[in-house]
Amino acid sequence: MNETRKFFNSYASDFDGIYGVKKYLLNYFINQLFRKSMKLRFEKAINYANPIQNKTVLDIGCGPGHYSIALAKMGAEEVLGLDFSDEMISLATKKAESQNLSHICKFMVKDIYDYYPTKKYNYSIMMGFMDYISEPRLLTDKIISLTKDKMFISFPRKNGILAFQRELRYRKRCPLYLYT
């Protein structure tokens, strides 16, 4: 896990750009070409979260807060984003503050395995998170115990050109787990 934490601390700003912040033209085109699935996953998860009004959300591996902030804007009562990357949480917190959503969106530097809430959440989200989990069953069991209504989880596919290029890019950066 330390390798993955280090990777995301160093990659936070670039990762944030995947969701549409146009820093450089080349990155924009790369994101459009190779990361369409991330945009589609985002849109589907947000749509499946309806109705969101008066719901509580736990966003595990929240990264820079894209899902959390979108759900808060749609009317979630409370959103808690967890990530073990200090840099990701810093980005998420700044975004929530800049959009006047910090009363709804809270963010914590926390590993989900070390999180023991006193309540259950209506929805739990783990998007782009299982890619870095070696024991998915342990994690899903924990999330089931924290969730009242719905869980949104993405599992990366093992086959295809996108999976192949990800395996090459991540090989020396951090562990990557793909599923069939």
Give the predicted meaning of each segment:
Residues 1-49:
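Conserved class I S-adenosyl-L-methionine
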Residues 61-63:
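Class I SAM-dependent methyltransferase "Motif I" SAM/SAH-binding loop
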Residues 66-112:
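Class I SAM-dependent methyltransferase SAM/SAH-binding core
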Residues 114-119:
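Short conserved loop adjoining the S-adenosyl-L-methionine
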Residues 123-134:
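A short SAM/SAH-binding and catalytic strip from SAM-dependent methyltransferases
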Residues 137-149:
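A short glycine-rich, Lys/Arg-flanked "PGG" loop and its adjoining helix->strand segment in the class I
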Residues 148-156:
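Conserved beta-strand signature within the Rossmann-like core of class I S-adenosyl-L-methionine
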Residues 158-177:
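Short, glycine-/aromatic-enriched active-site segment of Class I SAM-dependent methyltransferases
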